[in-house]
Amino acid sequence: MLLDEGWLAEARRVPSPHYDCRPDDENPSLLVVHNISLPPGEFGGPWIDALFTGTIDPNAHPYFAGIAHLRVSAHCLIRRDGEIVQYVPFDKRAWHAGVSSYQGRERCNDFSIGIELEGTDTLAYTDAQYQQLAAVTNALITRYPAIANNMTGHCNIAPERKTDPGPSFDWARFRALVTPSSHKEMT
């Protein structure tokens, strides 16, 4: 995987307006794994792109009426077939974590990269998703080495509100695919 000015060369780019600059040009030091499906439990279609670009039609599905007002984004989405979609350059602050805290530090969006996996808490993720997540993570570690020691789920930084990536995410499998490091901590 190649990074070019914060973008993955291999990713389909769908620029989101929902981002801003990190404070004091802070480098990312945390990877947050999420899941998403729109409508819930359904895969494919244009809805995730539409949510992250602020163009989701609230009338297209009853669920969308409750989320159309949100201004949210992630850096990347990895679809079930392994396609990588990038919405925000990694050096910018995507709006994926919300109210959050990691190891006593609040406002995780300031110092994290958010990667969404198309899926649910209870359905197994695909081989292609694990392979692509590991490839992206290894590229990020090369650029932002602190990430090697700081990878977690949305459920761990916002436990009162979030459950993703859920029990269906196999952290041991992911860990085995990421470049070995003797000091890695992933929860």
Curated annotation (Swiss-Prot):
Function, as annotated: Involved in cell wall peptidoglycan recycling. Specifically cleaves the amide bond between the lactyl group of N-acetylmuramic acid and the alpha-amino group of the L-alanine in degradation products containing an anhydro N-acetylmuramyl moiety. Is also involved in beta-lactamase induction.
Gene Ontology molecular functions: metal ion binding; N-acetylmuramoyl-L-alanine amidase activity
Signal sequence extent: none
Swiss-Prot/TrEMBL keywords: Cell wall biogenesis/degradation, Cytoplasm, Hydrolase, Metal-binding, Zinc
Family label: Belongs to the N-acetylmuramoyl-L-alanine amidase 2 family.
Cofactor binding, per record: Zn(2+) is required for amidase activity.
Biological process annotations from GO: cell wall organization; peptidoglycan catabolic process; peptidoglycan turnover
Family matches, as Gene3D superfamilies: Peptidoglycan recognition protein-like (3.40.80.10)
Protein name, as recorded: 1,6-anhydro-N-acetylmuramyl-L-alanine amidase AmpD
Effect of residue 116 to A: Loss of activity
Cell compartment(s), UniProt: Cytoplasm
Ribosomal protein among keywords: no
Site (Transition state stabilizer): 162
Gene Ontology CC entries for this record: cytoplasm
Cytoplasm listed as a keyword: yes
Activity control, per UniProt: Amidase activity is inhibited by metal chelators such as EDTA, dipicolinic acid or 1,10-phenanthroline.
Enzyme Commission number(s) of this protein: 3.5.1.28
Reaction(s) catalysed (UniProt annotation): Hydrolyzes the link between N-acetylmuramoyl residues and L-amino acid residues in certain cell-wall glycopeptides
Cofactor: Zn(2+)
NCBIfam families: PRK11789.1 (NF008758)
Pfam families per record: Amidase_2
Catalytic residue list: 116
Domain N-acetylmuramoyl-L-alanine amidase: 30-167
Chain residues that bind Zn(2+): 34, 154, 164
